[in-house]
């Protein structure tokens, strides 16, 4: 596996994986069914050796009988003002139209679930949560997408309460009793979901959809209990390689276009670990931990586990190149659909080429709210 580094901007190097930390499972086993009651993600790894049970937090915020925020809509058919709309042959949600650049149709839901599986494979213990957390706690997933992470956590911890929020109401209605979804919900708008009440808040793949990271981190900090943790998972999509196989390729040019277009919308997809850590510190977080994992674009590496990660990431990135490009390129550059598809087809072809030793970087952060006991 690529070496996990805790040092900012240290070069990613190759290292042999621990064979006991994973079991081989081919991509052909992936099930993209929409029920999501049981994904193929591995069990959650709890970092602490022993996690004592805790009573629900006492706070002044109103909750419904499930421990969720009172007055917040559960999953339901959206009213007319939230109807979906078509653009470039894809379906987008109408709530806060144009804020989020990605579609929400069946194809996109499959893509998000592929990334969910990829993250469990790439993080060598195949865990969903790395930060310390109580098994019967309150977990909040921001931008939950299909809800698969929240559902898996709810299955793992039946005595916990898990909530997911998202702009698009695409989560399944048949979720575990200890899991609730609130959508449409814009986590960048002012919100109160029980300040000082959550044991862990999770955010995955937020780059490209967030306008102000500092304000978001401050709001997350207010909602965590003292001593509780925030965990964030992001991908830096800038193509990298340790040789010259990327020189002059459309893959690099495509990313520069994508970077510029999303910067122009004030929601950049480019990820900076240095800025992320600085924003977390300025928001008031402590004990910030940063890990990096390399994601090969295709199985060019000889190592068996590297090839497994690469197969999953190749599937994920091949479903992402056009999806990430459609709205930014058409809305900002005013390119027509044929031009976008011509460019993205060439990029996908290069992503499949084993002679091109490209990779992206997966970034994982854990940050603690000061105070409270240590788990």
From Swiss-Prot:
One Gene Ontology cellular component annotation held by this UniProt entry? nucleus
Protein localization: Nucleus
Give the phenotype of cells or organisms lacking this gene.
Answer: Results in a complete absence of citrate production.
Q: Which InterPro entries match?
A: SAM-dependent_MTases_sf
| Species | Aspergillus niger (strain ATCC 1015 / CBS 113.46 / FGSC A1144 / LSHB Ac4 / NCTC 3858a / NRRL 328 / USDA 3528.7)
Keyword Transferase attached: yes
Question: Which segments of the protein form a coiled coil according to its record?
Answer: none
Catalysed reaction(s) here are: L-methionyl-[protein] + S-adenosyl-L-methionine = S-methyl-L-methionyl-[protein] + S-adenosyl-L-homocysteine
This protein's superkingdom?
Eukaryota
Record-given protein name:
Secondary metabolism regulator laeA
| E.C. designation(s) | 2.1.1.-
